[in-house]
Amino acid sequence: MTGTPAMTDAIDRARILQLVPHQGDMCLWDAVDAWDGDSIRLRTATHRDPAHPLRSGDRLRALHLCEYGAQAMAVHGGLRAAASGGAAAPGMLVALRGVELHVERIDTLTGDLECEARVLVEGEGSQQYGFRITHAGTLLAEGRAAVMLRPAP
């Protein structure tokens, strides 16, 4: 992790809920393990929840890892804004590129999911991140996601 000094104090779900618009069961991340101005590392066990809001037909498909990647971006944006004394600008996911899924489903995985997301490009009204999601060291999904930002409230 590069950029601003690394923040290594673990951040729990309660703090994540203060930073993002995703609330209740739709908040997919449980903890931030490390972050800096350019990147973030997170982990979660939410994929094992039988009541997961994205489940369909009693399965949680790997396609939903794109939402995990997008929410990693939101958590990172919230942390960056809070570190600057402000609030994150609301964003809307507008594109996914180069997404590769290496499994079909994730609800059967027993350990935590881990994600690393990194800012690739950003401007005043948009951001693009790369994300990689792993389980026990095995790559599950990777890709890029772009968001358009609205002015912060």
What is each residue range found by the language model?
Residues 2-9, 75, 107-111, 116-153:
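HotDog/MaoC-like acyl-thioester-processing domains
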Residues 11-23, 87:
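Short aromatic-glycine motifs in intrinsically disordered, low-complexity regions
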Residues 17, 33, 102, 116-120, ...:
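Conserved positions in beta-strands of structured domains
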Residues 23-61:
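Catalytic strand-loop segment that frames the active site of acyl-thioester-processing enzymes
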Residues 27-30, 94, 115-117, 143:
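Small-residue-enriched segments and motifs
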Residues 33-36, 100, 121-123, 149:
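A generic structural motif
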Residues 57-76, 91:
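Compact, glycine-rich, soluble single-domain proteins
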Residues 75-116:
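Hydrophobic beta-strand-centered segment that forms part of the acyl-chain substrate-binding groove
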